[in-house]
Amino acid sequence: MLYEQIAQNKRRTVYVMIGFLMLVLAIGAALGYLFMQNTLTGVIIAAVLAAVYMVMMISNSTNVVMQMNHAHEIKDASQYPDLWHIVEDMAMVGQIPMPRVFIVDDDSPNAFATGNDPKNAAVAVTSGIMARLNREELEGVIAHEVSHIKNYDIRLSTIALALAAVISLLVNIGSNMMWWGGGRDRDDDREGGAGNVIALVFSILLMILGPLAASIAQMALSRNREYLADASGVELTRNPEGLINALLKISNSEPMQAADPSSAALYISDPFKGRGSFGAHLFDSHPPIEQRVERLRNM
């Protein structure tokens, strides 16, 4: 059951990432069609921007994310010895280098991992998690975060964040060009027949709906990786109850104050406790706690 879940979530992640990349290139093509009379130029611009953003994000993601979430680094075991030794132990079991350890001063219990790869990774927990979780529960949480590092989820999350930023930038460029009178000549489109009109309408819709689709893809990726990290974390501790109890405590707590909204998908549980009505699950950064607990209990 465990290995089935891991394999299934890895496949879903591949599909979501392919869709994400195709969306970036499609929006680039729409931008090229609408404002440059050449879809290939738009695709090339989108690809170059995506590559630049990904390199920038990957090279400095840890420091950027930690600053955004007001986290401060623990240099040794003197401040939080239990936390330090649990991270050390779980990293050893997971066969990864010891990640950097950070604390976020927030009363709400939560945690996240970030970085580029296992050699350049970091784990952050809130002061609230240290106050409310026992050792067994904290081990479950840290094992979950170590699994994110081991499975390269941290890199995937960084890439998804960069691609979402590129989509937002491309759409902003298109909006500004449209506002200042750029774009295709309507007479040319009418002379080109129905095909050109359809392409024009589709391109405009893609520019409008692109950021929405990017957000849905980013959240879908996050949800899949949470299931995978839950399963992989239990593989490290051999104790699903520790993570189950931790998730239940975290889900019943108050929203965080220190978390940055753009980093919400990184946390083990939604730091803002967002839960909406019809269709809102598409924009949830995490699967429902009830479903995660059920899967853990079925292992």
Swiss-Prot record:
Membrane topology: Multi-pass membrane protein
GO biological process: proteolysis
Name used for this protein in its record: Protease HtpX homolog
Binding site for Zn(2+): H144, H148, E226
CDD domains listed in its UniProt record: M48B_Htpx_like (cd07340)
Record organism: Latilactobacillus sakei subsp. sakei (strain 23K)
InterPro entries: HtpX_protease, Pept_M48_protease_HtpX, Peptidase_M48
Documented EC number(s): 3.4.24.-
Coiled-coil residue spans: none
